[in-house]
Amino acid sequence: MNLHVISPGPLTTVQDAGRTGYAARGFRTCGAADGYAMRTANLLAGNPQAAGAAVLEMTLQGGKYQFDGGAVFALAGADMPAALDGRPVPAYTPLLARAGQVLAIGAARSGLRGYLAVFGGG
């Protein structure tokens, strides 16, 4: 399953749990800014063994994404209104998208960073 980016938010990045053990070599851990929200989205999307799996981290503004196959996904973090094919969908809930459906995520009403996790997120 691929997730096609139709239009990203201006500060949308791919994040994961970061890299540990490299500080002595000058590398910071980095990773998602809100690790709790990232892990929550991953767990809801069905990634419990990989709660640090890659997610989309959206700062202030979401974006528009199309699923090319069926997928379980979840949103967590900032309160960003979202709709799947024009129908509102809640955050903090496992959701199912079918092939061709478009997920539109709006601007944050509160909070700063929202997270989109998809089952199997690498």
Put a short name on every predicted segment.
Residues 1-122:
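Conserved "landmark" site that anchors the functional core of diverse proteins
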